[in-house]
């Protein structure tokens, strides 16, 4: 079983895959390109996630869940970013959209899932 952690920031998006022991197997990042509706950011996140998964040598079906750490306020139960001052998101159903683009069935917006997906060091490139 593997976990995907995503660090969504105003300047960059980082993603990494770890195993059940919390060992980071592969990580990568891309620049956050801001657009008015935010869909470009979600598409870039999806591309980065799929790249990291492929580069790890696993498939989307091997991912137990993905966790997103995001600035601002989020409704974890609905998978929605309510507001993010540095990003163009307002009541954005990011988990559903990212799931649609990647095929990852379980995506949470909550730091505890990001941490469980283990990303000690993900932000320190």
Regions of interest found by a model, annotated:
Residues 3-7, 62-67:
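Short glycine-aspartate micro-motif
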Residues 8, 71-72:
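Glycine-rich His-Gly loop
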Residues 34, 72-74:
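Feature marks short, surface-exposed loop/turn motifs that line or immediately flank catalytic pockets
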Residues 2-47, 80-83:
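Short glycine-rich, Thr/Ser-proximal phosphate-binding strand/loop in the N-terminal lobe
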Residues 13, 69-70:
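Short loop/turn microsegments at loop-to-beta-strand junctions
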Residues 38-46, 64-65, 75-125:
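Glycine-rich phosphate-binding loop and adjoining helix at the ATP-binding site
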Residues 44-60:
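Conserved active-site "lid/cap" helical segment
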